[in-house]
Amino acid sequence: MLKLILKNLWARRRRNVWLLAELILVSIVTWIILDPVIVTTYDRSIPLGYDTDRLCLVTLSTLQSQAPGYDEEAEDSAMIMKSYFNLTRLVKDYPGVESATPVLGFAYPNSTGNANTSIRAEGDTLDLPVMIMEFIPHTNFFETYGFRSGRGRTPAELSDYDYTENDIVMTENTAEHLFHTKNAGNKRCWSREGNDTIYSPVIGVVGNFKATSDSRPAPVIFRPLISIDMEDAYDDMRILLRLKENVSMKRFLHDFQPWMVKELRAGNLFARNVRSYEALITKN
């Protein structure tokens, strides 16, 4: 029986070779097409890691020197910062807003910009590539974004901590890569800047989150902005706000936008647009 089967296969070897080639070709094409789709679908199904349902982002801009109302004295870095904080306070005091925080820089969750570096655990020589996001201390940054608590300090405590220049906050996956534990508080990282060795104490840990909606959570560190030159930050000033529970996003945006255009001005700064974070994610 076996000899008969082998004889038949050999007699039809040319046809069988073509069938095998077709099967291989179909398998390759299917893998090329379906594998990225499956991976992307899986990545999109992973939770963002922060609460976007009640978030809005206000983008700021600045008057040009020839524009009516331009104030040359308001171009000082300290005056720009004062105006920025005044606008943030106005947003925070608007009816229906639970909290608001300045978002300064081009790298923030689901932004189109990114910043990267490499760090090492103290006593180790293995580099870990990480994304960098910056924040201004004492501005309710972590709890406004709705990051999940990690081991140690709560998001509110991390927002209100008295940071020094080299302190950092990291995500849980960063801590696990570097220290093989999610509890990285009071540990240190190090990096080199030229001939200098920079040690960075880990102040706390937040839950993993997706830097973009179609990616997996990557290692991220947060750096506090201690000394800020606002004259170089005109294109990167935003205000993140979180609505109170049960406030309609659609109704809020309908009422907030005309008020924003009329009232949200300070120095040479003004609000250019506002959108829900869900809309930002959809666009990006």
Annotate each predicted stretch with a short phrase.
Residues T139-R153, E165, V169-N186:
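Short, solvent-exposed hinge/capping segments at secondary-structure junctions
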Residues M1-W10, L87:
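A short amphipathic helical element positioned immediately N-terminal to and/or at the very start
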Residues P36-E122:
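Membrane-proximal extracellular/periplasmic loop immediately following the first transmembrane helix
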Residues A67-K82, L128-I132, D162-N166, F179, ...:
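Solvent-exposed, non-transmembrane alpha-helical starts
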Residues G113-R151:
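The feature marks short, hydrophobic/small-residue-biased sequence motifs that occur predominantly
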Residues R12-T41, Y50:
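Short, strongly hydrophobic transmembrane alpha-helices
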Residues G96, D127-I136, R151-V169, R188-N208, ...:
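Beta-strand-rich non-transmembrane domains
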Residues E172-N173, D196-N284:
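"Rare, low-scoring activations can occur
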